Amino acid sequence: MTVVKNDVMTEVAKTTAYAGQKMVDDDDAYDRIFATDADREMLERFWQESQIAVCEQLKRQLVSETGGENGDWSVTLSLSQSFDQALTLSMKKELGSFFVTSIVAKWFAFCNKKEAGDYGNAARELLIGVHKKALYKRKPSRPTYDA
């Protein structure tokens, strides 16, 4: 599975901009909360910490991890032969959502502490969901015979 870094960082920017814009009781919230290109160094650290969290959660299934030149990150998992391939796309989406939510949670720990815990919990749940899907085995089907 590959997580496209540019897509994740775009979603992080959208999420932080939205959160900053929607705060009605704080005039400086948007400027404080919105993650910009100037914050890339810190966001890069959070990107790497999210990779580590995925590897830790999926360490029994982990075969390899690789980073591309453009910063994208790929992980190869060893899954059961009974793994339901229909879950692959859902796993990829959930993994991408984990990265966005995890990075936003870590960012909010600095600039929006009220929402940081909720985002952290959501990130944990997303990663657990990826792990559950990786462990899921499709029930065997009985062979059918033509009479």
Language-model-derived ranges and their functions:
Residues 18-21, 30, 93-147:
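Short loop/turn elements at secondary-structure junctions
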Residues 1-78, 84, 132-147:
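Conserved short "hinge" loops at termini or chain/domain junctions
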